[in-house]
Amino acid sequence: MSTEAKCPVTGGATRSSSAGIQSNADWWPNQINLGMLHQHSALSNPMDPDFDYAAEFKTLDLDAVIADLKALMTDSQDWWPADFGHYGPLFVRMAWHAAGTYRIGDGRGGAGAGQQRFAPLNSWPDNANLDKARRLLWPVKQKYGRKISWADLMVLAGNVALESMGFKTFGFGAGRVDTWEPDQGIYWGPETTWLDDKRYSGDRDLENPLAAVQMGLIYVNPEGPNGKPDPVAAARDIRETFARMAMNDEETVALIAGGHTFGKTHGAGDAALVGPEPEAAPIEQQGLGWISSYGTGKGSDAITGGPEVTWTQTPTQWSNFYFDNLFNYEWELTKSPAGAWQWVAKDAGDVIPDAFDAAKKHRPTMLTTDLSMRMDPAYEKISRRFHQNPDEFADAFARAWFKLTHRDMGPVSRYLGKLVPAEHLIWQDPVPAVDHKLIDAADIAALKAKLLATGIAPTRLALTAWASAATFRGSDKRGGANGARIRLAPQKDWAANEPAELAKVLAALEKVQAEFNAAATGGKKVSLADLIVLGGCAAIEAAAKAAGHDVTVPFTPGRTDATEAQTDVASFAVLEPKADGFRNYLGKGDPRAPEEQLIDRAQLMTLTAPEMTALIGGMRALGANVGGAKHGVFTTRPGALTNDFFVNLLDMNMSWHPAAEPGVYELRDRKSGAVKWTATRVDLVFGSNSQLRALAEVYGTQDGEAAFVKDFVAAWTKVMELDRFDLA
């Protein structure tokens, strides 16, 4: 009898691993992924529990780091020689590709955690040979150690590379804290093979929130859509993918033209001669991949992708040659030595330097996506303006590069270092600085009483506080209660926020605010942002008291109120929840199951599974559902902070059955068949999923209510303070 393990479905051999023969996900692929809620913990982090990266960075000699990086740019190594004797373009590409995974749809990706070091990003086809760039950086990282993270160093190297090639950057903000394991919470696409594009449907409709055209690419295929060399069709892909990275047409042109002012692509020979990516490479290669057997495998023989293109006459010096060449020549289609589509200038002289032979020159070459900057009418208009106004182009590229490399860092208050620009930009979601004396403990107590006396139901106060704070995304540090943007477009009009009810609550809170501020002395004021959160605190305390528990919900003032001028409506529109399981709200447009959407939102809010469980139980006890729906409100005492949700969910005297309404279930008495409660899939998953049921059982015991109330208050406070970076 063979001892080889076989997959029970396919009959194929399975591979044993430290996790077991088959993972649970292999056996049950539809199982929800709670693991994404428990990543990046102290168990994978080698730093001390009290390690403070911001404090360490402040001790760094940043000038010395920059000097070392500048020296590195021209210190060509035999094991991976520098094109044109300068590593600048390689480090620009490394930083660009680290940041360029960002997508505005869910805020995930980006350079903020150093994820390019790990799978899958370290082995994406589009990141070929960036492993060499990071190895070139190792001596600098080794020298300065924990004072600068890999995430910061990779972006800084890109900035220094640009500066070393004569370009003036807009600035640099540090503060990116390294993670120590691959991020399992990012959906990169449905494909199971590199460069596949199952993400499209209909008339090239790209699945949300994806922001690249194929699996393993950062943005678009440089040869054109699916390798078809059509610049106009490529422009459509470019516009869509860059927009999903929060870039408009002008920023897109600036980034492409600015980035392609430098360096070259590498398609010296047959790509079939390139070895496996880092994650598939043999152990003796020590994490390096793409080892090529074509010639020397490096230098003039390097193969990174397919095209072999050098865009400008001075590939290691800032210039306007990109636009000169784009518009001064006509272009004909050709193929690289690797067989990839590219374009060569007609009737042009040999004016482009060779990367390794000073005696050789080449004709200008371009990618299909470069010609999009000329063939697409909107891109062409911008390109010609930049061509005629080099200073405007330089400023646009500097700003777009800064945005590219900082878009996932959140507010400027998180930036570290002396190179942070003084100018605040609207995409940083600015809020005013505190310019008044904050309320004290006596004021807080008095305001709570006034808020509860407004006539607004406590549950509605809690819903408003939740709607304000739960927009936060830990992915790109956007959203949250600070700024009180719930009173502004677009948030005030979101369906999940029940605009008509919200307007009543805000009017009542604004009256309390106006009365307090008019009567306060000594420059003391309360912001509406603080008052919204305080209303939630008062509501939770009242609900706990109604259940027989005396609690104080922690509250720290210090939020301010943003203005319309500080709020980019289009940028904030992406924060609108398509679903919010905590409020039992399910909108349209997301094909995932409601429970999957709940887990996704919990992960964006940096919640653990126990925190998520406590919050669901508490919100249901409050009756805090959108539209006043009764689904999941398994209690005869709505508004009291009891553990009834868990007790009744787990009651084996009852059974659940699908209702006539899609997505709704009925809880019936097993003997009489009478319907007692209704629920959604979000509610039922806490009894269905074994891990969530185990958590529900903790709170559903006779002695579980006190622990539940304590844990709910802690989780609630965490949500209210997710964007309070000043408290960290």
UniProtKB/Swiss-Prot annotation:
Annotated cofactor note: Binds 1 heme b (iron(II)-protoporphyrin IX) group per dimer.
InterPro entries assigned: Catalase_peroxidase, Haem_peroxidase, Haem_peroxidase_sf, Peroxidases_AS, Peroxidases_heam-ligand_BS
Entry binding sites for heme b: H260
Catalytic activities: H2O2 + AH2 = A + 2 H2O; 2 H2O2 = O2 + 2 H2O
Function: Bifunctional enzyme with both catalase and broad-spectrum peroxidase activity.
Quaternary structure (record): Homodimer or homotetramer.
Name recorded for this polypeptide: Catalase-peroxidase
Taxonomic lineage of the native organism: Bacteria, Pseudomonadati, Pseudomonadota, Alphaproteobacteria, Acetobacterales
